[in-house]
Amino acid sequence: MIQQTLCLIKPDATQRNLIGKILSHLEEAGLTIKALKKVQLNQEQAEGFYAEHQGKEFFAPLVEFMISAPIVAVVLEGENAISHYRELMGATNPEQRKAGTIRALYAISGRENSVHGSDSEQSAKREIAYFFTPNEIL
């Protein structure tokens, strides 16, 4: 099934000029870029995007990290794009990352893990709509 999912290239990766490498990794794996924009989130935007985590101990540090530098929001499309992209991303936990995944290659830590990806169809729809209007997705 053809799906769309959201990829965020996080501040740790944008600051280290890894945008092109990450996008190449995704395209070489068969995913198509349908929309892309570089964004500097403010506190309110970051809190809104991660609202489901409000009240958790990692919420405030995550928001601080996500507003520390620009991010790149990308809509990816492909066969089973959500699960395919999550496999390409690799695990959040550094000890569980498989070699060759984006996080194994580029992540600095559990929080500074270079990329975010939608975890379900419902999340993908909500997250894509957070960053893109329908006419921006080509």
From Swiss-Prot:
GO terms for cellular component: cytoplasm. Belongs to the NDK family. CDD domains: NDPk_I (cd04413). PANTHER family: NUCLEOSIDE DIPHOSPHATE KINASE, NUCLEOSIDE DIPHOSPHATE KINASE DDB_G0292928-RELATED. ATP binds at residues 10, 58, 86, 92, 103, 113. Its cofactor is Mg(2+). NCBIfam families: PRK00668.1 (NF001908). Major role in the synthesis of nucleoside triphosphates other than ATP. The ATP gamma phosphate is transferred to the NDP beta phosphate via a ping-pong mechanism, using a phosphorylated active-site intermediate. It comes from the Bacteria. It is found in: Cytoplasm. The gene is ndk. It is an enzyme of class 2 (transferase). Its EC number is 2.7.4.6. Its main location: cytoplasm. Homotetramer. It comes from Actinobacillus pleuropneumoniae serotype 3 (strain JL03). Keywords: ATP-binding, Cytoplasm, Kinase, Magnesium, Metal-binding, Nucleotide metabolism, Nucleotide-binding, Phosphoprotein, Transferase. It holds the Pfam family NDK. The active site is at residue 116. GO terms for molecular function: ATP binding; metal ion binding; nucleoside diphosphate kinase activity. This is Nucleoside diphosphate kinase. It catalyses: a 2'-deoxyribonucleoside 5'-diphosphate + ATP = a 2'-deoxyribonucleoside 5'-triphosphate + ADP; a ribonucleoside 5'-diphosphate + ATP = a ribonucleoside 5'-triphosphate + ADP. GO terms for biological process: CTP biosynthetic process; GTP biosynthetic process; UTP biosynthetic process.
